[in-house]
Amino acid sequence: MTVLKMTDLDLQGKRVLIREDLNVPVKDGVVTSDARILAALPTIKLALEKGAAVMVCSHLGRPTEGEFSEENSLKPVAAYLSKALGREVPLVADYLDGVEVKAGDLVLFENVRFNKGEKKNADELAQKYAALCDVFVMDAFGTAHRAEGSTHGVAKFAKVATAGPLLAAELDALGKALKAPAKPMAAIVAGSKVSTKLDVLNSLSTVCDQLIVGGGIANTFLAAAGHPVGKSLYEPDLVETAKAIAAKVSVPLPVDVVVAKAFAEDAEATVKAIADVAADDMILDIGPKTAEQFAELLKTSKTILWNGPVGVFEFDQFGNGTKVLAKAIADSAAFSIAGGGDTLAAIDKYGVGADISYISTGGGAFLEFVEGKVLPAVAILEERAKA
């Protein structure tokens, strides 16, 4: 994957527009989870150190396009950046017709989705973004799967279009895990439905040696193998699909599970052998024996890709499976990459973030890359690098 990299450019005195993913949760005007901002800070600092006039843009939430809304304003993000950088970071609302920014200055542009044509990737808007800068830096991996004005369109028209350090690191890490992984490779794919992760499962079945499934996905594979799943969430119409995937790659199945009679925070958890699952049981986690067996598989792996908790870890009595696997990944010497919102929440809960080789900032973009799909915002950077 050949793209121009911001780190290789002389940015002294240049007007640099950086597209970051600062779409963070905000409550009562305060940022409640800063992970994406923290991930973007090194890029912003580097551009300033290189002597650039720095303009940062992002979306936040899903406002009606072209209309300002207070709840989707980047004002709380500007306040957070000001505090984190120890300098005033002005929020600029009217910037499309040009803005005065000097070398060493930093401004944050208001939500790009307040601009008409952003989501439709309108050329007229993209050209206005491009006219603001000498160098465009795409650094928002989390939105790279969307062809929008500030992710794709601007890169078509900017004088120079480059990948920022965060985006470049994501592409390198994912490439390392998927293009030429050190073997053996294990993947953990968990979630409620096979249907939503079907392309991920199919893609990984061609590169990994062990495909560990969890959640509702595992229930469909258990049913495909003839095991009882009680009243657990599963997809009967995808049983044949599960069989076909299991014929291509080793899919180790749980030997024991944690069940309950209801899906509730105070539900009583019972460990059962898989053969003993009753008609009124719901499978809500893998059992302790299974967790240990899967942990052993992870210990011998050289590459691990993790997407999704294997149980309802939000309720502690159904969190042991995810906790054991999280610790096993952290303890492993393998190159490990993790991605997806629930996965990141599990990493936070069990405090293993420092011991995972790479944590992806992208949810949908992470999955689409794993599926082997082209990410439009990356494809345009590759095109521009060739030109």
Swiss-Prot record:
To which pathway does this protein belong?
A: Carbohydrate degradation; glycolysis; pyruvate from D-glyceraldehyde 3-phosphate: step 2/5
Q: Where does the record place it?
A: Cytoplasm
The entry's substrate-binding residues are: 21-23, 36, 59-62, 113, 146
> What Gene Ontology molecular-function terms does this entry list?
ADP binding; ATP binding; phosphoglycerate kinase activity
| A single GO cellular-component term on record | cytosol
Q: Which PROSITE patterns match?
A: PGLYCERATE_KINASE (PS00111)
- GO annotation terms (biological process): gluconeogenesis; glycolytic process
- EC numbers listed for it are 2.7.2.3
According to UniProt, the name of this protein is Phosphoglycerate kinase
Broad class of where this protein is predominantly found: cytoplasm
